[in-house]
A protein has these predicted regions:
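Phosphate-handling substructures
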Residues: 46, 87-147, 214
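Domain-level recognition of soluble alpha/beta enzyme cores
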Residues: 183-210
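Secretory targeting and sorting signals
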Residues: 1-14
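Glycine-rich phosphate-binding loop signature in dinucleotide/nucleotide-binding domains
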Residues: 64-66, 155-161
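Generic beta-sheet signal
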Residues: 22, 161-167
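Short, solvent-exposed aromatic-acidic interface loops
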Residues: 212-221
Length: 221
C-alpha cells in the first residue's frame, strides 16, 4: 500500500499552529546493514529476512498507537518496514523523498564502523552550529535540514494529529537534534538509533518541537 506523491502537490496548510505528536522510526535491517557497508543510494537495498522479522514485530508495538498518517522515504527499506504497520492500521504508506537518508558522498560503500570519523565528521559540526559544513560529495547541514523540514511540513499540513514516519538513522537523529528545543547531542554516539528504534516529538513546525522519547533499545529478532 504505497502511494507515490508528486513533488509540489502539498495540501493547503491548516490555519494556525496546532501541536501534533510525530513519531520517527528507523527502518529495519537492510542488506546493506548486514554487509556493514554504508549504502545511501535510492531506491537502495531491501530488507533482510531478519529485517522483515523486525518490521513485523515492530508493527505489533506501533499499531496500538493508532497513527492517523503513515509516511516513508523514497528508499525501499523504509517502505518495506512501514508495510506491516500500515496493513495493521488499514492505512496507505505515503512516500516523501525528503525523508530519505543523508547521502554519504565520498563515504558511500565504506565501512559503517568508520562512521564517527567519516560520514559523521561534518554532521557533528552541524550540531555545533556550523551548518555550512559539507559531507564531501554530498549535502551541507542547511541543505539537509531544508529537505527534511519540507517533508515534516507536508506531514503537518496533511492534518494528521498522530503521524508516524519511517526514515533512517542519520536523518532522524540529526534532524531531531538540530530542531528540538531540548537537544542532547551526546545521544548521537551514546544512544544511536538501532534498526526499528524510534523517537517521539511534540509540537509544530512554526513554534518548534520537544523531544519526548528516544528509543534506542536493541531491535527484536
Amino acid at each position: 500500500m504505497v502511494a507515490m506523491l508528486a513533488a509540489g502537490c502539498a495540501p493547503a496548510r491548516a490555519a494556525g499552529p496546532r501541536n501534533i505528536t510525530l513519531t520517527l522510526v528507523r527502518h529495519a535491517q537492510s542488506t546493506a546493514n548486514a554487509s556493514g557497508l554504508i549504502d545511501t543510494s535510492t531506491p537502495g537495498p531491501e530488507l533482510t529476512p531478519k529485517g522483515w522479522c523486525q518490521a513485523t514485530l515492530a508493527a505489533t508495538q506501533l499499531a496500538p498507537n493508532r497513527y492517523d498518517g503513515i509516511y516513508a522515504s523514497s528508499m525501499i527499506r523504509t517502505q518495506e518496514t512501514a508495510t506491516p504497520t500500515a496493513q495493521a492500521l488499514g492505512e496507505p504508506v505515503i512516500v516523501l523523498p525528503g525523508l530519505r537518508e543523508i547521502e554519504a558522498g565520498q563515504y558511500e560503500g565504506t565501512p559503517e564502523a568508520n562512521i564517527p570519523q567519516t560520514y559523521f565528521a561534518a554532521p557533528r559540526r552541524w550540531l555545533q552550529g556550523d551548518r555550512s559544513a559539507r559531507i564531501p560529495g554530498s549535502v551541507d547541514g542547511n541543505e539537509f535540514d531544508a529537505r527534511f523540514d519540507e517533508a515534516v511540513q507536508y506531514i503537518y499540513d496533511s492534518g494528521n494529529q498522530n503521524p508516524v514516519a519511517f526514515s533512517h538513522s542519520a536523518a532522524i537523529m540529526l534532524w531531531v537534534l538540530m530542531n528540538v528545543r531540548n537537544p542532547d547531542p551526546s545521544l548521537l554516539t551514546s544512544k544511536p538509533l538501532p534498526n526499528v528504534g524510534h523517537v517521539v516529538l511534540t509540537g509544530n513546525p512554526s513554534e518548534g518541537w520537544t523531544l519526548t522519547e528516544w528509543d534506542a533499545d536493541p531491535p527484536p529478532c
